[in-house]
A protein has these predicted regions:
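Residue-level signal for well-ordered alpha-helical scaffold segments within enzymatic catalytic domains
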Residues: 87-90, 94, 114, 118, ...
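Active-site-proximal helix-loop-helix substrate-binding element of RNase H-like nuclease domains
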Residues: 47-49, 54, 58-63, 134-170
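Acidic active-site catalytic centers that drive phospho-/nucleotidyl reactions
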Residues: 7-9, 112, 136, 167
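Non-catalytic, well-ordered alpha-helical scaffold segments
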Residues: 82, 86, 113-114, 138, ...
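Acidic, Mg2+-coordinating catalytic module of metal-dependent nucleases/exonucleases
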Residues: 103-110, 114-115, 149-195
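Substrate-recognition/cap helix-loop segment adjacent to the acidic, metal-dependent catalytic center
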Residues: 92, 96, 111-132
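Conserved non-catalytic scaffold segment of RNase H-like nuclease domains
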Residues: 2-4, 9-106
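A short, structured active-site edge motif that brings together acidic residues
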Residues: 40-42, 128-141
Length: 195
């Protein structure tokens, strides 16, 4: 699989926002198959030390979320950002069929992907994907609504909202469902049938 859905939990909404959790799942948008999954909480202090800038409104928003969602981002097992990025890169290297062609999906590409790339830069590390392979969940949602599928209405959420891995899995599922409606897979054997 060469499609990776990422979801970040952050303490801001700008490119320099501190990341507090990274969730990722490989998936095949043509079939909906889910592949290897990745999750880590990120130590907020390490992000601030690296130069990330929190946003008060986002912090206030987090304070209003469920205790489960808050607990996931304040885990004692949270890794320093540099270790979390190394773990993500190692996960991609182990799990991706062709890392050179890895496509990274974010909700949207101007949020998760940009913030994650900025974190790699703050830590003087090379991102694990090429910038030209950023893909946008929001564009797919717009297409889905145009063909009669609204993921917020038509696909129930399974898991804890605002958990980076649960969000990534949900996004991969609805991107796949939309992809299959927009570009249906041919029926097996249809290529061999007389036209």
């Amino acid at each position: 699989m060469n499609d990776l859905m990422i979801d970040l939990e952050t303490m801001g909404n700008k490119p320099n926002a501190p990341i507090v959790a990274i969730g990722a799942v490989f998936f095949n948008p043509m079939t909906g198959e889910l592949g290897p999954q990745f999750y880590t909480a990120v130590n907020l202090a390490s992000e601030l030390a690296a130069g990330a800038v929190p946003d008060g409104d986002t912090i206030n928003w987090w304070l209003k979320q469920s205790s489960e969602a808050r607990a996931a981002i304040t885990s004692d097992e949270a890794k320093p950002i540099a270790e979390a990025l190394d773990a993500l890169t190692n996960f991609v290297t182990r799990s991706c069929e062709q890392p050179k062609y890895l496509k990274v999906w974010g909700n949207g590409a101007a949020f998760d992907n940009v913030i994650l790339r900025e974190a790699y830069e703050r830590c003087s590390k090379a991102p694990c994907w090429n910038w030209f392979n950023d893909l946008d969940v929001r564009t797919m949602v717009n297409l889905g609504r145009r063909v009669g599928f609204d993921p917020k209405r038509d696909l129930p959420f399974d898991g804890e909202r605002h958990n980076a891995l649960a969000d990534a899995v949900h996004q991969a599922q609805y991107v796949s469902l939309i992809h299959q409606r927009v570009i249906p897979m041919p029926d097996e054997g249809s290529e061999n049938e007389p036209g």
